[in-house]
Amino acid sequence: MAYFNQHQSMISKRYLTFFSKSKKKKPFSAGQLIGLILGPLLFLLTLLFFHPQDLPWKGVYVLAITLWIATWWITEAIPIAATSLLPIVLLPLGHILTPEQVSSEYGNDIIFLFLGGFILAIAMERWNLHTRVALTIINLIGASTSKILLGFMVATGFLSMFVSNTAAVMIMIPIGLAIIKEAHDLQEANTNQTSIQKFEKSLVLAIGYAGTIGGLGTLIGTPPLIILKGQYMQHFGHEISFAKWMIVGIPTVIVLLGITWLYLRYVAFRHDLKYLPGGQTLIKQKLDELGKMKYEEKVVQTIFVLASLLWITREFLLKKWEVTSSVADGTIAIFISILLFIIPAKNTEKHRRIIDWEVAKELPWGVLILFGGGLALAKGISESGLAKWLGEQLKSLNGVSPILIVIVITIFVLFLTEVTSNTATATMILPILATLSVAVGVHPLLLMAPAAMAANCAYMLPVGTPPNAIIFGSGKISIKQMASVGFWVNLISAIIIILVVYYVMPIVLGIDINQPLPLK
């Protein structure tokens, strides 16, 4: 257990150092300084020199704002969340929206869905339910190296559907490293050292990749999907329900996890090690250390099941009571959160209730503000006439094969998100794709859904996603290895996303991909 705690602490320090070491000496890096100046400069140049005849002044103004915000998001000239507050200042100044209209977007139902999801995830982490779930899954799947690898991927992927992918990977990596350490200590004379090293690398990458892939399973699994839900509602007035997305997302996760497991086990790090010395013993030992399920864990488990059932059945069961429009996914998320604040804990030395307001310190408020900023900007694009104008300009693409457009969008976003924030990428590109769908005459989800899914999938570089940074921080994998393996996982993801969006999603969501929707 000491080894487990030691490695968790070590990884946390490396993870933080990875993102902070370049910012110790100067307030801005060279790239940030360029972005800091370039953003307002593009804003001014657009206002002064860009005046198409068929674009009203308000549209030019919102385009200028968009270029400013996008530049600061990409370069992270200031914190992304701080940049996301710019619409509150700039949109009312241009008489695009009133202050009340802009501010209301930061309190959208979708933001409260994610807020409730965060609170539920923190409750799981506080009472260590996620560790028990992960270890139980690994223990059930089996003891061979192939099954241990699969077990870690399934456990991490499942957790990341409901808790942040960062938290899921941070929990699983120390367990994985402890198993590898045990294998080295118990190594038999006839055990191939190279095989253990290959298994070690495959396990570390498997955990990181599964944390990223699992987020595609539910709307609260990853920020780009919440942004997709919000932008789709904002531009077209239609909802993507929690239940229907799960029917699309979970099979996607299962297929991606399965193919990635096969690739890591039999192609990228092929080895002859069938059983890992001490592996299954250590898993059982850690389960024993957790002891019997505590009262607080049972409460959180019950609340988790209740939340899942309500999200899944809301659309189907509430229709007969004619209150579907009054009970949104965000309503359920906040109801569940309030229950967690009400129910008392037995272990009152640590916490009086299952969740208390100390949880506010752990909530990622910056992500919620980013969502609000994206929705406010989308509203401005729609109200100013910019969306309509963009649609007219993009009509030249009409006649291009929709599948070709989907392929280009998916691959472009997949590699763009390797070097930019996935939330910022989705927030920037989805409004453009909403307009493009009208111009080329296809259903908006045919373009928006693959972009949102691809924005979540970055496997090549440590800066691509927090899970990548964590596994790189373990010291077990080099950037070169991560890039070479991640490139092929990127391509695998692109193929699966394209197939799912083109052939599965229309059936599940009941949409005609060749039928465009009018912009609001």
From Swiss-Prot:
Disulfide bonds: none
TM segment ranges: 30-50, 55-75, 77-97, 104-124, 160-180, 207-227, 242-262, 298-318, 323-343, 362-382, 399-419, 428-448, 452-472, 491-511
Source species, domain of life: Bacteria
Keywords: Cell membrane, Ion transport, Membrane, Sodium, Sodium transport, Symport, Transmembrane, Transmembrane helix, Transport
A single GO BP: sodium ion transport
Family annotation (InterPro entries): SLC13A/DASS (IPR001898)
A GO molecular-function descriptor: symporter activity
Principal localisation: membrane
Membrane topology category: Multi-pass membrane protein
Pfam families reported for this sequence: Na_sulph_symp (PF00939)
Record's subcellular location: Cell membrane
Entry coiled-coil feature ranges: none
GO annotations of cellular component type: plasma membrane
Additional information: The binding of Na(+) at the extracellular surface probably precedes the binding of dicarboxylate, since there is a competitive activation of succinate transport by Na(+) and an uncompetitive nature of succinate on Na(+) affinity.
Protein function: Mediates the transport of the dicarboxylates fumarate, malate, and succinate across the cytoplasmic membrane via a Na(+)-electrochemical gradient. Transports 2 Na(+) for each dicarboxylate.
PANTHER family, alphabetized: SOLUTE CARRIER FAMILY 13 MEMBER (PTHR10283), SOLUTE CARRIER FAMILY 13 MEMBER 2 (PTHR10283:SF82)
Family: Belongs to the SLC13A/DASS transporter (TC 2.A.47) family. NADC subfamily.
Protein name as catalogued: Sodium-dependent dicarboxylate transporter SdcS
Biological source species: Staphylococcus aureus (strain Mu50 / ATCC 700699)
Upper lineage: Bacteria, Bacillati, Bacillota, Bacilli, Bacillales
